[in-house]
């Protein structure tokens, strides 16, 4: 973590942040600002987006119980670029999202946010743990337009998902593999 927690985006000292960073909320989906070049960042728009995100609570919207009593805040993280990915790194990072039942990952999807004409378009591909395509998909998201190779440390990623989901009836474990290093993203219940 580079900075925070902040209770309001107005508390953030952008001058103290590095040239590249990510600002995100601890309690929602999509409430983040990716900054690849601070000199081009619209600070006012970033503050507006983050302050709006702080007002959301997924418990009231969709009854996701982990969000009910969380105190919303903003924090800064390192901006990451995968120079080893078989996907175009100019388009973003690949998310590995494991669906785990009682400590056992059963399948996963590869998540990817692609920018098309300035509009973010999420794409995802469901796979079995052996990397064969799953027999199901989400019709509200397009599958990947390219093929990815299994990361070299794939077995370790599966093991981490098992460890993090142990003793939990259901949880989605999200990981990144960036430059052959595994990073934890989040748990979704």
Residue ranges of each PLM-predicted region?
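A conserved helix-loop-beta module that forms one wall/lid of the active-site cleft
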Residues: 1-40, 45, 52, 56-65
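Short, solvent-exposed loop/turn elements at beta->coil junctions and helix N-caps
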Residues: 4-10, 79-83, 176
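Short acidic loop-to-beta-strand element that houses the catalytic metal-binding Asp/Glu
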Residues: 13-14, 20, 97-99, 175-176
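Phosphate-binding site of ATP-dependent enzymes
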Residues: 17, 46-139
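A short beta-strand motif that forms the metal-chelation/ATP-contact edge
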Residues: 21, 100, 181-189
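Anionic group-transfer/hydrolysis microenvironments
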Residues: 26, 79-80, 99, 176, ...
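Short acidic-glycine loop/turn motifs at beta-strand connectors
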Residues: 37-38, 100-104, 178-180
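A long amphipathic alpha-helix within ATP-dependent nucleotide-binding catalytic cores
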Residues: 69-74, 84, 123-183
